[in-house]
């Protein structure tokens, strides 16, 4: 699958046409990467230098959460994302640090886009930035609702499937 086809399937790029997607694919930092089962893609607290688009496979997004009875932090599954999903979006939102840890749940193929490159593209082409930001807000809202449910119910790992908003 071409990089443009991968972006066409991604939830935050759905509002863009082929010429806009080509501008993203042509960024010097846009490249494909692969990760093996259980390989850490990034960790919470690291600088968010790249946006990731999942082309193939599944990725666990985990947060370190303490329980009411303990101050120890334990990894808590926030969601499992699949093909067409975006992760690593903090590269687009200051202060540009990852808040979750991403781990390959299977062998994965990812399209990686440099954060500074795509932010500069948004300044050059504000309509691209607007469309991506509008769609990104839906992704963030969905993940926020997931975290709310974890806090309200006290359940860990409440999502074991791809959320409905991915359309996959």
Language model region names:
Residues 1-168:
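Cytosolic regulatory regions built on CNB/CRP/Popeye-like sensor folds
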């Amino acid at each position: 699958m071409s990089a443009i086809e991968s972006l066409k399937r991604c939830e935050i790029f759905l509002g863009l046409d082929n010429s806009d997607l080509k501008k993203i694919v042509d960024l010097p930092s846009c490249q494909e990467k692969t990760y093996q089962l259980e390989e850490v893609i990034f960790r919470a607290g690291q600088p968010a230098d790249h946006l990731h688009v999942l082309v193939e496979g599944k990725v666990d997004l985990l947060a370190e959460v303490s329980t009411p009875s303990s101050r120890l932090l334990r990894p808590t599954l926030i969601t499992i994302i699949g093909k067409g999903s975006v992760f690593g979006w903090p590269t687009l939102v200051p202060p540009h640090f990852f808040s979750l840890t991403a781990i390959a749940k299977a062998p994965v193929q990812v399209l990686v886009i440099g954060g500074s490159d795509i932010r500069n593209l948004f300044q050059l082409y504000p309509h691209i930035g607007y469309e991506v930001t509008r769609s990104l807000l839906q992704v963030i809202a969905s993940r926020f609702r997931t975290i709310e449910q974890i806090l309200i119910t006290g359940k860990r790992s409440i999502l074991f499937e791809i959320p409905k908003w991915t359309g996959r």
